[in-house]
Amino acid sequence: MHGWNRLTAFLLFVVAIPAAADCSRGGTAPIADLRAGVVAENGSVTVDGIVTGVFLGRNRLGGFYLQDDRQPPSGLFVYAPRLGPGNLRPGQRVQVEGRFVRFHGRPQVSRIDTIRDCGYAGRAEPVAVRLPEDAGRLDALQGVKVRFPDALTVTGNYELGRYGSLRLSSGGRLLRTGAPGSGANAHADRQIVLDDGSYRAEPDPIPYLDAQGTRRLGDTVQGLTGILTHAFGAHRLHPTREPSFIAANPRPEPPPAAPAPLRVSTLNVENYFLTLGQRGARSQAELQRQRGKLAAVVRGLDADVLALTEVENRREALTDLVRQINRGLPQGQRYAAVAHPDSGTDAIQVALLYRPERLDLVMTAADVDPVHNRAPVLGWFRASAGGPLLGVAAVHFKAKVGCPDTGDIDRGQGCWNRLRTNQARSLLEWIDSLRRDGAPVVIAGDINAYAAEDPLDLLRAAGKTNLAGRDLRPSGRYTYVFHGEAGQLDYLLAAPAVAKRVTAAGVWHINADEPPFLGYSGRRPASGPWRSSDHDPVWVDLHWR
């Protein structure tokens, strides 16, 4: 921001703006002309208008917004960081003399010489905006007081703890369920960022939290009113009235107790590392929090078989995780790890846990095809009381990150899509080669592909069914959120013969909807299972006798 003349700054800071000043002098520049570039930059200007938003004081924007009374209105930011917050109020007409500049492309008046109080003119009526809206119209309303009369849904909270902002959308939250690459423009037109009247990092207190200290995705807000602007690549609203949220997506209860003999679940442990300072915990305190969170998740899932992803590829890490989980469990509910025949050389591995009091482990195998960077592991299980075999294969396909410049680049399904598709093909061939007496196999884990992408198309073509899909509405079929879009990356997949035995299934939305600062390494880690990972666990109950 641009500095002030020291004497002027001192006077404005100490002395209130004079009331009933003479504002009749001519030569004022229309705000619309300033915004349109008619007036040269870095020159002295005089503007007048009605104060619509005051963002003065410590850790605020350091200024206020003016708006003219034309139709359509035009608005402008006045940068006045030394002006006390009690000197201005919305509805006040003022005349400002200063320097016209553009800050990061946004027009504003700074280096203030004089601010005159021209009396109270009444609060400006907000301009109604309904999403989806064309970006051109939103650009024309920058600096203007607006109101969103419709309900908006919280669809992104990644930057809430970092910058005090939420991503909102019209028509419900943004879902990644369609064909690859579809809906991108429509999603862009449906979004607005709710900011907090500042651009400071790590705000304290964190705004917009509920009584539980969270703000979950899926919550709603209606009648949002404030000043529209564009910064950091997005249209943003700085509210002039405190937003009132509705907890439309409350924290869910654990999956109900399973009446069926067998429950299988996925569980992403978000880099459970004993080696501190690597991908996982940075300190012993963070590791202890991570252990507590994961133990709470396992207790809530109450699964007989758990397919884990993102465990440090060290035997000691898996052993420690199992020990920590078992500490709070009674004897008949404790877990044992399936020994991975060949976990490969990647920094992380997949793993299988099971309850030996309820299940017998018959055989294990690993898919050592070099196409896999994390070798899948398969365990064949039979109920301790007897019954048919069931295989569970823990998998973790290549992520959509670390993209190459050429080759397997992003063509609408994220980079490495071709590799993930080849991993799916290899997995199917490997499972088919291991079939024991026609026993089916449940593929469990992180495919890193959305439901309509090539790897899932290939798995479906081979007869694999999304076991949790039957019991979930489309709006609930997600396990991960990226850039405000929710989609399913984690699956339990099996043949129709297994799907017929499903008695209940679901996704336990304990992670993806929660802000990251509640995680084990966050600014305000929550107790219990909340934000124990960035992926939600998927579970299924099977009538398997």
Segments from the language model and where they lie:
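Active-site His/acidic residue clusters
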Residues: 386-388, 394-417
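Structured beta-strand-rich core segments of catalytic domains in phosphoester-bond hydrolases
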Residues: 317-398
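Solvent-exposed loop/turn segments at secondary-structure junctions
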Residues: 71-73, 84-85, 101-104, 199-201, ...
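Metal-dependent phosphoester-hydrolase catalytic domains
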Residues: 216-224, 228-249, 314, 356-383, ...
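Extended non-catalytic accessory segments flanking core domains
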Residues: 21-277, 283-297, 327-329, 359, ...
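N-terminal, active-site-proximal structural segment of metallo-dependent hydrolase catalytic domains
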Residues: 21, 236-349, 405-428, 439-440, ...
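N-terminal signal peptide c-region/cleavage motif recognized by signal peptidases
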Residues: 15-20
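Structural recognition of the beta-strand scaffold that forms the well-ordered cores
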Residues: 64-67, 96, 146-148, 193-194, ...
